[in-house]
């Protein structure tokens, strides 16, 4: 089932095009990296579409606007968690903007799990968000475990009932190892497998 999707020329071409975009992000500047981090902050507990729309509403204000302005923009865009996420964006900017790429690149180049651990120090970034960020800046060895991947693994019998909203770190790593085994069997990276599963579950490649 999944193997045929991975081997489908049309779907594979679309997925690999997205992968190339992530690889280009890896070569991009600090502004691009912080924008991707902001997207991941906004995606937590929200849909990707809602987060992406909110990010576009914010534009370059993520780099300089104060918390009140960011909160107001998020609210006007009908983004649900405008108070909390405005606070997180400001905290992240004060903590890592200007040195994000410099600090994460050497870590991720040598050990992506260590890079993920470093990102967990940013308020609002959990295992999924850190993995999502690293994938979006060109690192593909970590799984982005959301409800779509949980549903998929449950349907194929790889896991039992799992509450995606209350994943402990150890449970996340356990589920990630299941996905890595599936990816290894298909001869692709787990971060790329995610895109195929996302396509199968949503018929889109926007993640």
Swiss-Prot record:
The keyword DNA repair applies. It holds the Pfam family Ogg-HhH. Its EC number is 3.2.2.-, 4.2.99.18. Keywords: DNA damage, DNA repair, Glycosidase, Hydrolase, Lyase, Multifunctional enzyme. Catalyzes the excision of an oxidatively damaged form of guanine (7,8-dihydro-8-oxoguanine = 8-oxoG) from DNA. Also cleaves the DNA backbone at apurinic/apyrimidinic sites (AP sites). Belongs to the type-2 OGG1 family. This is 8-oxoguanine DNA glycosylase/AP lyase. It comes from Saccharolobus islandicus (strain L.S.2.15 / Lassen #1) (Sulfolobus islandicus). The gene is ogg.
